[in-house]
Every structure is written in C-alpha cells, then in structure tokens.
Amino acid sequence: MGLILDSSVLVTAERQGQNARQMLTSVAQRVSETEIAISVVTLIELAHGAARANTSERKAKRQKFIEELQTAMPIHPVTVPVALRAGKIDGENRARGVQVALPDLLIGVTALELGYSVGTSNLRDFQRVPGLTVVRL
C-alpha cells in the first residue's frame, strides 16, 4: 500500500529546514507504506506558495524544495477517473451540506483510486472523503 502526502506535511518539513530527501526519510520511518508519493495538485499548491513568498531568499528556498521533490518521489496526475470520482463525491457531499476544498478532494480521490492512504496534518477535510484512510503526520 502507498501513501500520498498532503502539502501540509511538505510545508512543515520545508519550514523546518529539511530538504525533500530528509523529509521523505523522516516520513518513511513513521509509516509502513511501500510507496510515498504526492499528487500533482500538491505540486500546484507548493508552486503557489513559492510564488507568494515575501522574500527572494524564501522563494528560492521553496523553489529548490519543489525541484528536489520532483526527483525524490513519484508524482501522480489527476486522471479522468479521479476527476469523475471527485465530482461525484463533491456533489454527494454538498447535497448533505458537507464541503471539502477541491485541492484536498482531488488529492484524497487520487489516493483512493490508487488504493493508498493520505498522510497529512490537516485531518478535517480528508476525513470528509468517504472511504479514504487518513494518516496523521
């Protein structure tokens, strides 16, 4: 089984001064999953954060972290089955008055489609994705 990391885990690691490989080693020591990966949506969130950095030093540090991630672990795309399943879950959730942020929903459904769990420090949204196993990191 595998684990898709949410951006919350990556942002925390980057802020603590870890590079991508150190973060991956740290996570691997805490979980038993055979593959640790991210969704392309997480890459979008990280790129957004780098673009919004308030100093050129912070921007460069974040961009370096993003570059390292691209060679440190698999990055899974949003596929047509992921998009359709996410749309179905979003519609059903909203009909019940439950809302999940679209990036988190796409990350969660990517994990579901792969038979993986999601590793995050943001349990709230991911616990609203039916059938998803969420691991607190």
Feature annotation, model-predicted:
Residues M1-G2, G108-L137:
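Acidic, PIN/NYN-like endoribonuclease modules and their adjacent C-terminal/linker elements
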Residues M1-I38, A51-E67:
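Short, well-structured N-terminal submotif of metal-dependent ribonuclease cores
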Residues S8, A47, K64, L105-L106, ...:
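Active-site phosphate/pyrophosphate-handling residues
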Residues T12-E14, M23, G49, A86, ...:
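Residues that scaffold the ATP/ADP-binding catalytic core of kinase and kinase-like folds
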Residues S39-V41, V78-V80, S121, L137:
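Conserved beta-strand termini and adjacent loop/short-helix elements that scaffold enzyme active sites
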Residues H48-A51, A72-G119:
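Active-site neighborhoods of divalent-metal-dependent phosphate/nucleic-acid chemistry enzymes
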